[in-house]
Amino acid sequence: MQIWVDADACPNVIKDVLFRVADRLQVQVTLVANKLLRTPPSRFIKAIQVPAGFDVADNEIVRLVQAGDLVITADIPLAADVLEKGGHPLNPRGEFYTKDNIQQHLTMRSFMDDLRSSGVDTGGPSAFSQGDIRAFANQLDRYLARQRSKG
């Protein structure tokens, strides 16, 4: 099991949480982005830079992810692809995308895209908060504890 990070849009504070977890639990964390990323020196942390372009980083994650891997992303279509490959997508606000909820997320995303394309100002997501960071860290810890107990 390893952790993949859709790093172009992942908040730095979430990356910091992942960096600490990588060293503490000796789990591989790989960031994928279309820009150069700075990572702390660690044999458990690496970054993959892909060419710029629409969904290039997402496609690389889908290509590399294995069943049982954790993928950190807020990108709903990427989360759907990860689920298809048996991965576990977790967004930076601490919500897992699952086979039970992914269709609802895809439908809402499509609806909001339609509103925006018709000129409606839908605003954006709420500001990232300390509560979001705690929710993410708690879900991450629970997930990793379950993985360790499986052996």
UniProtKB/Swiss-Prot annotation:
Output the superkingdom of the source species: Bacteria
Q: Which NCBIfam families match?
A: PRK00124.1
What's the source species' lineage? Bacteria, Pseudomonadati, Pseudomonadota, Betaproteobacteria, Burkholderiales
Give disulfide pairs as residue numbers. none
InterPro entries attached to this UniProt entry: UPF0178
Database matches in Pfam families: DUF188
Listed name of the protein: UPF0178 protein mma_0312
Instruction: Spell out the family assignment given in the record's similarity comment.
Output: Belongs to the UPF0178 family.
